[in-house]
Amino acid sequence: NDLMSLGIHRLWKKTFVNYLNPQANTKLVDVASGTGDIAKLFMDKVNYKSKVCCVDENINMLKFSKKKLNNQNNVKWYCSKAEKLPFKNNEFDYYTISFGIRNVSNINDVLRESFRVLKPGGRLLCLEFSKVKNEILNKFYKIYSKSIPQIGRFIVGNVEPYEYLINSIEEFY
């Protein structure tokens, strides 16, 4: 995400969590949790006085998230699909999904599941890349996005994840 957003995703995530307006003694499910950035920002905001469940299909991402969150007792990690969460009905005050909704197999199932696990009056927030509407910026974006896989090859020695990222954004819209 640093490469794709030129690091701006950090500001987006911080703004996202601020907009969520987390309160202490609540419960968050962070779906497509990845490296745990949203969970960490949430817990920092409530001084670790809440509970968080990080959900991701990728076990390696969850391992990274555990390290980032220092394996806190009030944070739990689940390797699961967004379409079938291992939680009771009405369990969470907040449901977040960032940079993950475009990767699910069925958005309607994910949304249905999110509302199932949210308490009445709970908050659902989704953060995702989008298409650029400004024509001038869109031209810059198209040039930049075509160069991202090559930059990925240079920096991490791999183009596939970056090609997937660009393609998944294009296909989502």
What is the predicted function of each stretch?
Residues 6-24, 41:
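Conserved alpha-helix/loop element of class I SAM-dependent methyltransferases that forms part
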Residues 27-84:
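Class I SAM-dependent methyltransferase SAM/SAH-binding core
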Residues 56-57, 106, 129:
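Short beta->alpha hinge that forms the Motif I/post-I loop of the SAM-binding pocket
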Residues 83-95:
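A short acidic, Gly/Pro-enriched loop at the edge of an enzyme's catalytic core
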Residues 93-106:
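A short SAM/SAH-binding and catalytic strip from SAM-dependent methyltransferases
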Residues 108-123:
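A short glycine-rich, Lys/Arg-flanked "PGG" loop and its adjoining helix->strand segment in the class I
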Residues 131-173:
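C-terminal alpha-helical "lid/dimerization" subdomain adjacent to the S-adenosyl-L-methionine
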